[in-house]
UniProtKB/Swiss-Prot annotation:
SUPFAM superfamilies: VC0467-like. This is UPF0301 protein NMC1274. It comes from Neisseria meningitidis serogroup C / serotype 2a (strain ATCC 700532 / DSM 15464 / FAM18). Coiled coil: none annotated. Belongs to the UPF0301 (AlgH) family. One of its GO terms (cellular component) is cytosol. InterPro entries: AlgH-like. It holds the Pfam family DUF179. PANTHER family: UNCHARACTERIZED PROTEIN YQGE, UPF0301 PROTEIN YQGE. The lineage of its organism: Bacteria, Pseudomonadati, Pseudomonadota, Betaproteobacteria, Neisseriales.
Length: 182
C-alpha cells in the first residue's frame, strides 16, 4: 500500500492534540515510513513574515492564505506543496503535477509568473516511522482518500476536514472508530 498523494483524515474521536480533526496530505510513503503536511491547521506565522524574509511581495492570489502548521516535526523549517513540480533545489515529486519543496528558492520565485501556479505553505511536517502509519490505520485512527487538488489548494483551510469527509461520502457524526464485538 502506497498512500503518497492521498489524504489522511483523522477519525472524529481522535484525541491527539495536534492531529484531532486534521487532514494530512501524504507526500511520501514507502517501506521506511511516511511524510505528510497537515493542510488544515493554521500556524501563527503569517504570509507577510514568510515573504518579507525573502524580500519578495506576497502574490495577490495568496494575500488571504494562512501558513499551515504542517506537523510537529522541524517546525522551524518551511515546506511548500505546489504545482507544477518545477526544478527546485530540494523537492520530492508527489504526483505528476504536485511536489513538496523545502528549499527557499521556491518561495523566492512564487510570485514570478508561471513558476508556481498553486501553493500551500507550511511550517513543520508530519512523520511516521516504519510500520507506524500502517498500525494507526489498522487501529482505525485514520481514513484515507485519494488527494484532491481542489481541497488541497482552493478550499479555505477551515473547510478542508468537512470536504475530505464529503469526498469519502461519509458523515463524520455517524462514525465510531472502536472495533465491534458481538
Amino acid at each position: 500500500m502506497n498512500l503518497s498523494n492521498h489524504f489522511l483524515v483523522a477519525m472524529p474521536d481522535m484525541e491527539d492534540a495536534f492531529f484531532s480533526q486534521s487532514v494530512v496530505y501524504i507526500c511520501k510513503h514507502d517501506e521506511d515510513g511516511a511524510l505528510g503536511i497537515a493542510i488544515n491547521k493554521p500556524s501563527p506565522i503569517t504570509m507577510d513574515m514568510i515573504f518579507s524574509a525573502t524580500g519578495k511581495n506576497i502574490p495577490m492570489r495568496m494575500q488571504h492564505d494562512s501558513v499551515m502548521m504542517g506537523g510537529p516535526v522541524q517546525v522551524e523549517r518551511g515546506y511548500v506543496v505546489h504545482t507544477p513540480i518545477g526544478n527546485w533545489q530540494s523537492s520530492i515529486g508527489v504526483s505528476d503535477n504536485i511536489a513538496l519543496t523545502s528549499s527557499r528558492d521556491v518561495i523566492e520565485n512564487i510570485s514570478r509568473e508561471g513558476a508556481v501556479d498553486k501553493a500551500l505553505i507550511s511550517i513543520g511536517y508530519s512523520s511516521w516511522g516504519k510500520g507506524q502509519l500502517e498500525r494507526e490505520l489498522a487501529d482505525n485512527a485514520w481514513l484515507t482518500v485519494p488527494a484532491d487538488e481542489h481541497i488541497l489548494f482552493d478550499i479555505p483551510y477551515e473547510h478542508r476536514y468537512a470536504a475530505a469527509f464529503a469526498k469519502l461520502g461519509i458523515d463524520p457524526l455517524a462514525l465510531f472508530s472502536g472495533a465491534g464485538h458481538a
